[in-house]
Amino acid sequence: MSTSENTPFNGVASSTIVRATIVQASTVYNDTPATLEKANKFIVEAASKGSELVVFPEAFIGGYPRGFRFGLGVGVHNEEGRDEFRKYHASAIKVPGPEVEKLAELAGKNNVYLVMGAIEKDGYTLYCTALFFSPQGQFLGKHRKLMPTSLERCIWGQGDGSTIPVYDTPIGKLGAAICWENRMPLYRTALYAKGIELYCAPTADGSKEWQSSMLHIAIEGGCFVLSACQFCLRKDFPDHPDYLFTDWYDDKEPDSIVSQGGSVIISPLGQVLAGPNFESEGLITADLDLGDVARAKLYFDSVGHYSRPDVLHLTVNEHPKKPVTFISKVEKAEDDSNK
């Protein structure tokens, strides 16, 4: 596996039509190897349909901890919550790491661009991350969710500006915003300014209102929006005591829907090309005419002819934000000699 950060394609897409597939499916909770095998089956199926781009939901690897307690409460600390976090941390993956190697292999073997939602562990801090892979079996890089939502902030760290890539590829300019990051106008604007054409939106939001957000972003950004959400039943989660839901979910029957999906593909002209699917696990596939990007931007280009930088201007800090910086003795000596 090799990595490539923001590698420019420096050209137009090799074809004006790109077939893209969204995978709407549930994580195999507390079992990352089984989740990877499930991902493999869906990737193979999508590739057999001629798809060049495959997008998975938020936190597909590692799992979205819907309904988890983690013992949280203001001023509350308990052993049950700590042990829940221990198990959740064990399901997360290192980036890079063996699971990333496996995903790169799957992308290369099936000749697809792959966008995978994963829970990344960096030491003992977790991040909600989107991973990008090329048909050549390369790990292109990652985007860490900038702002976890609500109680997600108690279990996930915040990404920084160093991981907001848009990759210039033969099938279009590819990037991602995760779940409610899509409600952050300034982050969307940063992606638009990087020329995003294939706007991937891995999410855990299966609400009807989410569809309105996706439609707006497609029109606002003049880009294709590919929103992937998990479809989960209560029986997809472990039973007590291995998985402890909040009371509302505890009342549900095994076949009751816990996450209803709603995955959808929308064109830059605001046309729903596939989905939304609120019924089951499965694939959602559409052919994307990249010429629609130019057609849409005739009338509206939010970071071009329809912008007013003399009045409104955005500055994006892409420097990594680390809590500790170590300066070696050699670097310190060189720094002292320059004073």
Swiss-Prot record:
EC number: 3.5.5.1
GO BP term (any one): indoleacetic acid biosynthetic process
GO CC aspect terms: cytosol; plasma membrane
Subcellular location: Cell membrane
Protein name in the entry: Nitrilase 2
Primary location group: membrane
CDD domains xrefs: nitrilases_CHs (cd07564)
Modification N-acetylserine occurs at: 2
Catalytic reactions of this protein: a nitrile + 2 H2O = a carboxylate + NH4(+)
Induction info: By indole-3-acetonitrile, abscisic acid (ABA), salicylic acid (SA), sodium nitroprusside (SNP), salt stress and dehydration stress.
Membrane topology: Peripheral membrane protein
Domain CN hydrolase: 18-290
The keyword Cell membrane belongs to this UniProt entry's keyword annotation: yes
Organism for this UniProt entry: Arabidopsis thaliana
